[in-house]
């Protein structure tokens, strides 16, 4: 898969949790760092996302959400 986005973090899916319409996918990128993405349940199904799959988190600056730790 080729993308123009430069902020790509490779890892393994640690967890997939589906809600009513939107799900959360956690990607373990190593060193104890987990990236969580909110995507539609339809996207989870179409991509056949499962725990243990190799995955990549693609981050666009316009889509980054900041939370307080």
Q: What residue ranges belong to the model's regions?
A:
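Non-catalytic connector elements of ABC transporters
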Residues: 1-69
């Amino acid at each position: 898969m080729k993308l123009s986005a430069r902020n790509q973090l490779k890892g393994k899916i640690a967890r997939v949790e589906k809600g009513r319409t939107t799900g959360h996918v956690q990607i373990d990128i190593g060193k104890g760092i987990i990236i969580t993405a909110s995507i539609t349940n339809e996207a989870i199904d179409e991509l056949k996302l499962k725990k243990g799959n190799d995955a990549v988190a693609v981050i666009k600056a316009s889509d980054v959400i900041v939370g307080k730790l």
